[in-house]
């Protein structure tokens, strides 16, 4: 059966170039998605440039909001950066912010 009432859980969830789109449509929805997704680790990515090549100005506020959420919940946060994207790894099982 493809439909079940049992919750689906995962070790990790990838929100690649998704968080900022959800958050822009409904304030708080991105944070809620990270908080409520049934996964111990959530990796969120943000593009560093928008489609026209300009710097993405939304990355910093979203990163700050994720850090506040992690602090409130006692989750660990690690960050990584490539030339085109920034990644935020939220670990719901480990406490404290890492760099």
From Swiss-Prot:
Source domain of life: Bacteria
InterPro entries, alphabetized: rRNA_MeTrfase (IPR025981), SAM-dependent_MTases_sf (IPR029063)
Gene3D superfamilies xrefs: Vaccinia Virus protein VP39 (3.40.50.150)
Cross-referenced Pfam families: FmrO
Record protein name field: Uncharacterized 10.9 kDa protein in fmrO 5'region
Record organism: Micromonospora olivasterospora
């Amino acid at each position: 059966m493809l439909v079940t009432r049992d919750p689906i859980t995962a070790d990790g969830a990838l929100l690649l170039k998704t968080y900022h789109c959800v958050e822009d449509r409904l304030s708080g929805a991105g944070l809620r998605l990270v908080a409520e997704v049934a996964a111990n680790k959530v990796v969120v990515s943000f593009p560093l440039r928008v489609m026209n090549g300009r710097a993405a100005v939304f990355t910093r506020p979203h990163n700050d909001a994720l850090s506040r959420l992690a602090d409130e919940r006692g989750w660990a946060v690690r960050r990584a950066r490539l030339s085109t994207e920034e990644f935020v790894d939220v670990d719901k099982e480990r406490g404290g912010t890492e760099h």
